[in-house]
């Protein structure tokens, strides 16, 4: 089915004031509510990336997400909620004190928790798993939409599956125009990478996907050991982002690991190619001092920010990759950054996006 996709911007003033009650009164939200309750899709902003939402209790509606994105149906979706009453309706378990502390600390925010699901959640949403990832986003437009529909919203990133996640409404329009009826615009996403997904066990917290909440932040709250789980290609994914290739633009991405001689040799041997170098401020300054920049009009230099401000780098990453994908670059070379804090989430995305290392 082809849609005439509408993009409606929510007033910035209401978003900045976090005025959920006024946002819910907007005609755009009422339109979005009608779409959701009639089994249609609505794209909306969160603090991480834009989400493509459907009623998580309606299997037919959720199937439309997989179709619009071209997403494999064994890749589970996260159920987004707006309050703890909804949380109690979507899970079938009692939470312990440690998990309660984690939820109270990081919700609303970029943290998803895997728990046994209730019968309310469609098995299409969970890819036939008996567990569901649950998250309470902090963006006022997301919370307004979830509250006004009184439905948990299944919502992966609102993009074509495999491409960089959308951090602006126009990114959603680029990918999904004609495939969905409505996009709610809410400005640029503050975090810029998806939520952290965790599974809490008796003695440990398993990070299934690094994201907007770092392992260091989790360690400050919980005494449990924190470990990272990587999914093999043959295993059924417990959470989004574990099995399939993600986050990659159509232009080839190479990862620069700091080997200067290898980089210099590559640039020299490929001086006729149109290249984009996405480097940190420190590396750009160092190369300038050594006069190692190749004076070549085919090379575009993008400063992604300082290694001392990894949150800023995370915020820009998907936006930069999408913008460079619109240019005539043959290769995008992105510098590896420290895997601490949110840098772990950034590198998780870059490892998946890159086809080669330098």
Where are these regions (language model features)?
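Active-site-adjacent structural elements in enzyme catalytic cores
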Residues: 1-358
């Amino acid at each position: 089915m082809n849609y005439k996709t509408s993009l409606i911007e929510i007033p910035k003033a209401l978003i900045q004031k976090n005025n959920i009650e006024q946002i819910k009164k907007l005609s755009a939200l009422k339109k979005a509510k009608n779409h959701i309750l009639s089994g249609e899709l609505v794209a909306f902003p969160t603090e991480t990336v834009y989400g493509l939402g459907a009623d998580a209790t309606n299997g037919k509606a959720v199937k439309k997400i997989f179709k619009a994105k071209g997403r494999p149906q064994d890749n589970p979706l996260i159920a987004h909620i707006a309050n703890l009453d909804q949380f109690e309706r979507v899970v079938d378990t009692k939470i312990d004190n440690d998990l309660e502390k984690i939820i109270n600390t990081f919700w609303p925010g970029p943290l998803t928790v895997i728990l046994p699901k209730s019968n309310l959640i469609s098995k299409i949403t969970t890819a036939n798993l008996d567990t569901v990832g649950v998250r309470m986003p902090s963006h006022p437009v997301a919370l307004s939409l979830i509250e006004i529909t009184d439905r948990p919203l299944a919502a992966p990133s609102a993009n074509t599956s495999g491409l960089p996640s959308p951090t602006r409404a126009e990114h959603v329009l680029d990918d999904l125009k004609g495939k969905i009826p409505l996009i709610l615009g809410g400005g640029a996403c503050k975090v810029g990478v998806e939520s952290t997904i965790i599974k809490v066990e008796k003695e440990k917290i398993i990070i299934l996907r690094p994201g907007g909440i770092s392992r260091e932040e989790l360690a400050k709250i919980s005494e449990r050991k924190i470990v990272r789980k990587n999914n093999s290609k043959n295993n059924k994914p417990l959470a989004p982002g574990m099995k399939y290739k993600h986050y990659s633009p159509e232009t080839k991405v190479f990862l620069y690991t700091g080997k200067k001689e290898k980089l210099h040799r590559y640039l020299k041997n490929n001086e006729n190619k149109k290249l984009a170098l996405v480097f940190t401020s420190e590396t750009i300054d160092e190369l300038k001092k050594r006069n190692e920049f190749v004076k070549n009009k085919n090379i575009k230099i993008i400063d992604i920010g300082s290694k001392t401000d990894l949150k800023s780098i995370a915020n820009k990453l998907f936006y930069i990759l999408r913008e460079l994908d619109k240019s005539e670059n043959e290769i995008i070379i992105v510098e590896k950054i420290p895997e601490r804090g949110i840098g772990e989430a950034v590198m998780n995305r870059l490892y998946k996006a890159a086809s080669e290392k330098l």
